[in-house]
């Protein structure tokens, strides 16, 4: 039947050809078949290696095997594969833009007519049989089929037409077709990892076996280049297959390429191979390999290039090369700081030295040039920029101060030198004073290996009370002392497992600890986290040295390898005087851990290693303590390297010019040949293992080991790379080993007159520099830093020798042609031309220690020059701190030779005093004072303590236990002035301590001012009886008055957005005039600007808008503009460049909030923008129209006072509108914007209203419209007072900045008795009253030549002029720890005394009538001395505040003050509640004033707590 059907189909085809088409149409219609051509799915095709002629070539196909896409491919029956041979392979490859993905256009023809004709024939066949059935009766048909069974229809009438998937692409014309076949893709075994692949310690199922991911075998092919075409439906992918018995290994450098061609299996050279070096766009160079298979090609190396080649057999290969400069020879600037870690507010000292390198060896001094330094904090903000001068010989040095609010993290020093940018780094961490002290009392001062470390952790509150039941968490990390190759250094920190990591203190605040013994000399870093239930833990770290006095012996042999059975002489010598002597050696064979030992004596011993391998030889004393170690390799039969690697061991770690370097080469298998080369900036020399060369000697030791000798020449320094490369069995491997040529360094000797000093003593450091054993004059930079800084942060800057003369990196990159990957992704075909692609084709809490000075850098000498004899010295005062200090000296001479040395000294004192309590009190306070006495000895001692104010000291006898002792002091009446303590032992003074007490008034005080004139020798003063902080300042002339007001602004206690900007704005304006004065004043002003600017940055809200006190709340258009205005002036003063679009942001909130913003604030915003050179004409037109239509403003019941704020306090008043009109009209005239007629008519009336108001702010606004003489400016500036709005004072100073240009008219004489001369932030001198009582006269030595105008300021109580309708209620709740961490319950304190070891919740509730809304207020809450508000409330939950559920405390928001804290209240309406965590550390009895709420822009309007909840506080 099948033969009959095929014959019938042939007839049907003939009928279609011969019969007219119309005849076909005459037949019955054909029903739809429902058949659609097989489309297929996308797949990947790739060749992941090259093949030799005896290997079966294959390609990899990755088809989607686990989703619906598989079912779109599976009916195709597999994948059609066609294999073509490319006749001119190099020409073909040269035309390719991407050798990984070659382009070979397909000939898409579609499926063809075979399936269509099959369906038509079956359809017509059925119909014809039906016709035949109707022509004959059933009986006739039955008789015929019985006679001829072949004529039976069977299932032919009902069986569906079978369809065959045909290739839809024609063969590629012009390419010989080697073979084609359909590979059963879905029946083939997928690629899977070997059965024995198991990865210990991780999942071995990381590779899933996926159907459709298969290798397709192509058979063994002749040498050449082949193209593989894979087809599935409309989808087609191509890739190339390289078949060659040769492999090309390439070494690319900056301007050349070395190619070595070798047999793939044997590894022997292949000569006369044609090689092309291309970058994908064209051939850069070409040539043929020589008899050794080597070829050098010259050309500048691109980042990516290819080597394509064809050997004499026709084999084709390709390798890909990547090049980048590892070592760049240019000017190197070595920049480092005095220490790696700083705290906010610290001074950072830095030094730069430089050399200009011509190549790896030659350098000259970097040229003198200016350096622009930028300091960038951890958030990426530029803090400041400095201009330094770099000198060719001495380099550059500078210093700057970090802001007090500097963020923690890594900081960058970025400096521009001669058009290039360099960088260095340091870190900043904030150390917070803990609310209790953590001390570690060790059982003994020194511990040895194998000995447990025992001791006690002691926790004490500042008042000496023990911290009972505190939870401790311990973390121990060990740094082992390394003695490999005689280098004694601490290795990386590794955690040490503790038997118990959590402890609890007993009733005495003590917890015993026992740390595991160290097996080897180590440094233990014990970190302790202690918590008494506070919101955060106290962290402290302690350094414990295990056998810190261990000797260091240098152990060496003539060479680092030998032959098996060869006698090796080892020698050893101590590097420092020590009583420890070696008694034995021990060797360990690393391959099997076999070991042996023996005695040593007289500084040498001999060993004979019978078995080849790698050995570690150690030197130990009679206690088994490690004193020295070295490594040794032994050659011999059977030694192999790890498979896939080559081992190269040189006999010495370092050589001198003229010596011969000997290396032992070990291969993992016997090899016939290998490529040996010397490399650095290019391949300097080559040799074959089978032939050798004139630059080396070779000796074959056994089939896998060779020995090579290389004479060391001068040009090898500082180092050269020796490379060994071989290829065999289809793999290649290479190993680089460095030949280091020793470069002499500047040797530095550091000597001090003794090893231990007491605080306050003068330390003299003597330095000596030598080069090649002879004295040499050098430039030294020396720092003396607290060693614990390096325990927190290791040195960031590399050693100066490592920076300038580090081993040069190898600039040669090695690659091979063995694993070049070519790939393609299958895409559907189309009979139309493809569209052009629219793309380019081109490719912490502080460590608490006995210290009274927070000094981390004791001395810094940025430029110390030794004389011709190499001598120099310097001295410094030992800081008042007991610790170990690290002296680091870095040297560089005029020839560029460098050196570095570090040494240690200690500051120690047997008995040490430390004050831990507060020094500020209120009048009438009765504190229970005490201090800490540290007994640094090992035994308890007796001593005598004298303490008290001068003239009335009291004596008490002390029994001082080892460690820290808290000593309570007898109660004495407090007074302003000095207080001292003196500790005596055996009639000698062991330590002294001095503090100064300040007594504040027992109630609220405000700063007040009087303008006086000193005209006689004796001048009366009229001060109230409660006056405090009395100051006298010169107000003679506008400049003095201006700076006096600037000082008042800078001393303002609060720091919201407006207050910070009000400090920053006038200071930035005055800074250029003040920067030319005293450097100390300049640096301080610069720091204040940085602090203020950084605080503004930190208070920025969403979209960089600003609210009154920052935070994630809706920004305010006026405050945003004001902050940017101040920052604009500050950035110019600090020389910080910001993009122009940055300043455009002030107009964004104006556009959104103009209708809700008061007109006065809108006028000021546009005035700010005008000063910042922003376009405002259109916005000004809108403001002018709104002002023309505005009324007269809101009427006030009472006239404005001088202390009332207008801009933020009452901008819509009549005076506020008048100020807006005057500002806007003046601005319109400057910009030539038309003023509406109604507004022009109102202008004069507005000006007159401002004159009548008589406010300092409005008078300053009027004065800014015209020139003001010095007398007028001085009079106006003297009217500004600290009680007035900071915003309006700042704007007045901005408008009157011309007063700074006028020369000062006089200066204060020498202060009389009891007055002390001090200087404000701006550098202006003032007198501070230091006498007893209140001054009533100012007595001068003589009458001044003319009356001197002065401003007398003081703090005194003042009754508020207005009582606000605010009810204040305050309560203090004790926190009782709950079951979980950071969970508490509360209980009322009542009349019970407070405890210094507990935590309290301070809750304040404000209530105002519902129809009242108050803006911009401050809630001030008094605290007793020693009380602190916890900085964070994160994670704390408190139950019992409102209902049964626990309440999570909101984020703490407060401003610190003198014996109080403030809470900013942006808007007050209804009832608001504020909660803060408070701790009371000072014992005693204290009286507190009531809490108060005041409006910051109308400070005379206040509300006081009616019944003070904390009027009397007793702390026990």
UniProtKB/Swiss-Prot annotation:
InterPro entries: A2M_N_BRD, Alpha-macroglob_thiol-ester_cl, Macroglobln_a2, MG2, Terpenoid_cyclase/PrenylTrfase, YfhM-like. The keyword Ligase does not apply. Residues 1-26 form the signal peptide. The keyword Translocase does not apply. It comes from the Bacteria. Pfam families: A2M, A2M_BRD, MG2. SMART domains: A2M (SM01360), A2M_N_2 (SM01359), Thiol-ester_cl (SM01419). Keywords: Signal. Belongs to the protease inhibitor I39 (alpha-2-macroglobulin) family. Bacterial alpha-2-macroglobulin subfamily. The lineage of its organism: Bacteria, Pseudomonadati, Pseudomonadota, Gammaproteobacteria, Pseudomonadales. One of its GO terms (molecular function) is endopeptidase inhibitor activity. It comes from Pseudomonas aeruginosa (strain ATCC 15692 / DSM 22644 / CIP 104116 / JCM 14847 / LMG 12228 / 1C / PRS 101 / PAO1). This is Alpha-2-macroglobulin homolog.
């Amino acid at each position: 039947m099948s033969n009959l059907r095929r014959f019938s189909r042939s007839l049907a085809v003939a009928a279609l050809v011969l019969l007219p088409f119309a005849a076909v149409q005459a037949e019955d219609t054909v029903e739809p078949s429902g058949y659609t051509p097989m489309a297929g799915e996308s797949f990947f095709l790739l060749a992941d290696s090259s093949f030799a002629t005896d290997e079966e070539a294959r390609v990899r196909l990755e088809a989607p095997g686990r989703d619906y896409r598989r079912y779109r491919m599976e009916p195709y029956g597999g994948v059609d594969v066609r294999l073509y041979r490319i006749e001119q392979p190099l020409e073909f490859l040269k035309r390719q833009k991407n050798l990984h993905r070659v382009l070979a256009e397909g000939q898409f023809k579609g499926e063809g007519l075979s399936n269509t004709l099959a369906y038509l024939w079956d359809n017509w066949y059925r119909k014809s049989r039906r016709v035949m059935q109707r022509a004959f009766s059933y009986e006739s048909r039955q008789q015929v089929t019985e006679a001829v069974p072949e004529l039976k229809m069977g299932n032919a009438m009902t069986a569906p037409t079978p369809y065959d998937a045909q290739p839809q692409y024609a063969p590629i014309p012009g390419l010989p077709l080697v073979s084609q076949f359909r590979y059963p893709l879905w029946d083939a075994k997928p690629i899977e990892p070997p059965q024995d692949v198991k990865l210990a310690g991780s999942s071995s199922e990381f590779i899933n076996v996926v159907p459709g991911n298969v290798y397709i075998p192509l058979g063994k092919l002749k040498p050449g280049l082949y193209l593989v075409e894979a087809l599935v439906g409309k989808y087609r992918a191509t890739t190339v297959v390289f078949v060659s018995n040769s492999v090309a290994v390439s070494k690319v450098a900056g301007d050349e390429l070395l190619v070595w061609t070798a047999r793939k299996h044997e590894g022997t050279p292949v000569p006369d191979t044609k090689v092309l070096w291309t970058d994908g766009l064209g051939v850069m160079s070409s040539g043929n390999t020589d008899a050794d298979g080597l070829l050098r090609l010259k050309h500048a190396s691109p980042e990516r290039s290819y080597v394509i080649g064809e050997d004499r057999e026709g084999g084709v290969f390709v390798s890909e090369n990547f090049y980048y400069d590892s070592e760049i020879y240019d000017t190197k600037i070595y920049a480092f700081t005095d220490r790696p870690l700083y705290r906010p507010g610290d001074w950072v000292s830095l030094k730069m030295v430089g050399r200009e390198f011509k190549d790896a060896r030659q350098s000259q001094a970097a040229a003198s040039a200016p350096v622009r330094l930028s300091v960038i904090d951890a958030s990426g903000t530029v803090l400041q920029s400095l201009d330094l001068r770099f000198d060719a010989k001495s380099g550059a040095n500078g210093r700057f101060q970090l802001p007090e609010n500097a963020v923690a993290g890594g900081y960058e020093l970025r400096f521009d030198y001669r058009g290039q940018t360099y960088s260095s780094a340091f870190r900043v961490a904030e150390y917070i004073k803990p609310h209790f002290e953590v001390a570690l009392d060790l059982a003994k001062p020194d511990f040895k290996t194998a000995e447990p470390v025992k001791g006690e952790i002691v926790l004490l509150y500042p008042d000496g009370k023990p911290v009972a039941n505190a939870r401790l968490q311990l973390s121990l990390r060990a740094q082992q002392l390394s003695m490999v190759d005689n280098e004694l250094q601490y290795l990386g920190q590794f955690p040490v497992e503790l038997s118990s990591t959590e402890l609890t203190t007993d009733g005495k605040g003590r917890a015993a600890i026992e740390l595991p013994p160290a097996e080897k000399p180590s440094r233990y870093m014990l970190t302790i986290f202690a918590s008494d239930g506070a919101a955060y833990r106290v962290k402290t770290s302690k350094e414990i040295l295990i056998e810190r006095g261990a000797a260091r012996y240098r152990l060496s042999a003539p060479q680092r390898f030998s032959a098996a059975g060869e006698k090796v002489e080892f020698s050893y010598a101590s590097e420092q005087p020590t009583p420890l002597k070696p008694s034995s050696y021990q060797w360990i064979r690393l391959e099997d851990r076999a070991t042996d030992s023996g005695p040593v004596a007289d500084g040498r011993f001999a060993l004979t290693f019978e078995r080849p391998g790698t050995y570690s030889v150690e030197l130990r004393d009679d206690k088994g303590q490690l004193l020295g170690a070295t490594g040794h390799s032994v050659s011999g039969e059977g030694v192999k390297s790890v498979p896939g690697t080559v081992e190269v061991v040189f006999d010495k770690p370092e050589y001198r010019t003229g010596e011969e370097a000997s290396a032992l080469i070990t291969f993992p298998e016997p090899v016939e040949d290998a490529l040996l080369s010397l490399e650095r900036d290019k391949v300097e020399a080559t040799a074959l293992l089978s032939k050798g060369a004139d630059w080396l000697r070779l000796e074959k030791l056994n089939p896998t080991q060779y020995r090579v000798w290389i004479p060391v020449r001068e040009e090898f320094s500082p180092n050269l790379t020796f490379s060994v490369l071989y290829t065999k069995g289809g793999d290649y491997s290479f190993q680089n080993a460095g030949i280091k040529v020793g470069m002499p360094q500047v040797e530095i000797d550091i000597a001090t007159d003794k090893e231990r000093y007491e605080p306050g003593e003068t330390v003299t450091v003597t330095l000596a520099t030598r080069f090649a054993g002879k004295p040499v004059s050098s430039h030294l930079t020396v720092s003396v830093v607290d060693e614990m800084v390096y325990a927190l942060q290791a040195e960031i800057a590399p050693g100066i020798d490592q920076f300038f003369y580090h081993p040069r990196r190898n600039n040669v990159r090695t690659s091979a042609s063995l694993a070049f990957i070519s790939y393609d992704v299958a895409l559907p075909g189309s009979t139309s031309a493809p569209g052009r692609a629219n793309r380019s084709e081109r490719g912490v809490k502080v460590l608490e220690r006995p210290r009274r000075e927070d000094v981390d850098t004791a001395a810094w000498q940025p430029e110390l020059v030794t004389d011709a004899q190499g001598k120099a010295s310097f001295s410094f005062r030992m800081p008042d701190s007991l610790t170990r200090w690290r002296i680091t000296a870095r040297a560089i001479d005029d020839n560029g030779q460098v050196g570095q040395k570090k040494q240690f000294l200690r500051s120690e004192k047997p008995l040490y005093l430390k004050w831990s309590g507060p020094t500020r009190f209120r009048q009438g306070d009765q504190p229970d004072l005490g201090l800490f006495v540290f007994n640094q000895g090992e035994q308890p001692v007796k001593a005598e303590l004298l303490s008290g104010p001068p003239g009335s000291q009291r004596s008490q006898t002390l029994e001082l236990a080892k460690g820290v002792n808290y000593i309570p002091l007898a109660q004495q009446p407090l007074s302003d002035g000095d207080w001292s303590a003196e500790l005596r032992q055996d009639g000698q003074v062991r330590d002294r301590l001095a503090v100064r007490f300040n007594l504040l008034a027992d109630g609220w005080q405000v700063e007040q001012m009087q303008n006086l004139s000193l005209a006689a020798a004796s001048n009366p003063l009229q001060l109230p009886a409660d006056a405090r902080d009395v100051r006298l300042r010169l107000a003679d002339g506008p400049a003095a008055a201006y700076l006096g007001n600037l000082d008042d602004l800078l001393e303002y206690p609060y720091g919201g957005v407006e207050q910070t900007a009000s400090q920053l704005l006038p200071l930035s304006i005055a800074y250029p005039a003040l920067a030319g004065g005293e450097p100390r004043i300049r640096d301080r002003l610069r720091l204040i600007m940085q602090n203020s600017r950084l605080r503004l940055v930190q208070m920025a809200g969403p979209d960089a808008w600003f609210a009154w006190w920052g935070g994630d709340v809706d920004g305010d258009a006026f405050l945003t503009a004001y902050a940017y205005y101040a920052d604009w002036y500050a950035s110019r003063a600090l020389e910080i460049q910001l993009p122009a679009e940055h300043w455009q942001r002030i107009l964004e909130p104006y556009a959104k909030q103009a209708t809700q913003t008061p007109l006065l604030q809108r006028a000021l915003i546009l005035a700010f923008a005008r000063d910042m050179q922003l376009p405002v004409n259109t916005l000004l037109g809108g403001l002018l129209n709104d002002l023309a239509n505005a009324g007269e403003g809101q009427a006030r019941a009472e006239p404005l006072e001088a202390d009332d704020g207008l801009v933020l306090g009452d901008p819509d008043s009549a005076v506020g509108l008048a100020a807006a009109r005057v500002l806007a009209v003046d601005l319109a005239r400057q910009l030539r914007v038309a003023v509406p007629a109604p507004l022009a008519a109102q202008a004069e009336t507005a000006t007159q209203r401002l004159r009548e108001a008589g406010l300092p702010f409005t008078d300053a606004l009027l004065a800014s419209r015209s020139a003001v003489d010095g007398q007028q400016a001085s009079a106006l500036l003297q009217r500004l007072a600290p009680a007035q709005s900071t915003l309006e004072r700042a704007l007045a100073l901005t408008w009157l900045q011309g007063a700074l240009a006028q020369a000062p008219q006089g200066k204060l004489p020498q202060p009389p008795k009891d007055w002390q001369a001090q200087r404000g932030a701006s550098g202006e001198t003032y007198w501070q009253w230091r006498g007893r009582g209140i001054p009533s006269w100012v007595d001068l030595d003589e009458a001044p030549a003319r009356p001197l105008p002065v401003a007398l300021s003081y703090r005194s109580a003042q009754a508020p002029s207005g009582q606000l309708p605010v009810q204040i209620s305050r309560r203090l709740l004790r926190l009782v720890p709950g079951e979980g961490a950071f969970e508490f319950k509360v209980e009322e304190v009542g009349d019970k005394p407070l405890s210094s070891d507990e935590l309290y919740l301070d809750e304040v509730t404000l209530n105002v009538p519902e129809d009242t809304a108050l803006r911009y207020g401050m809630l001030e809450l008094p605290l007793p001395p020693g009380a602190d508000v916890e900085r964070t409330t994160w994670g704390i939950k408190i139950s019992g505040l409102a209902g049964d559920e626990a309440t999570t405390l909101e984020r703490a928001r407060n401003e610190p003050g003198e014996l109080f804290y403030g809470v900013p209240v942006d808007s007050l309406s209804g009832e608001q509640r504020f909660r803060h965590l408070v701790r009371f550390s000072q014992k005693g009895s204290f009286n507190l004033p009531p809490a108060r709420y005041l409006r910051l822009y109308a400070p005379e309007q206040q509300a006081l707590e009616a019944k003070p909840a904390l009027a009397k506080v007793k702390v026990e």
